[in-house]
Amino acid sequence: MDEVFEALPADFLINVEMKVIMKGMRVIAHKAAETVRRHARWDSTLVASFNPISLWELRKTEPRINRGYIWSKTHLFPIRSRIFSPLIKANWYDPANDSYNPKLHQRFRSGGASVLAWDLDFDRDMERMAAVRLEAVVTDSLQEMLDLKQEFASRLS
């Protein structure tokens, strides 16, 4: 994380995913908090996880860090269920690929949270993403998405 924070501009949103099921979740949450704290990246870091307990631990350790709760249509582990959402008090909700839901998006937005969705759930269609007012997009094709964004912005101007 240190290398990423040092390489990218301070206002660039960085989505850090804590990939943990059970063992080590407190350690990972504390290490993530230490790194965000050391770099003072409060507004430009989102720490996300499928694991609500690790996000709760992060919230207890450093409540200033923006938390993102990832969910999926299919949950391999019951702990990934959205029933734990109130415990986490997430700032962002992050549907896993193929899990975007417009009704949930509106519910989270009305509660003051933002949604970070996968570009593939919208077939990388900027117009569709703009229509639902996505706050951010996850992509594995950064340059392609930047080009699409530029093209879309040019059409609007």
List each language-model region with its residue ranges.
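Short loop-to-alpha-helix "cap/lid" segments that border enzyme active sites
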Residues: 2-157
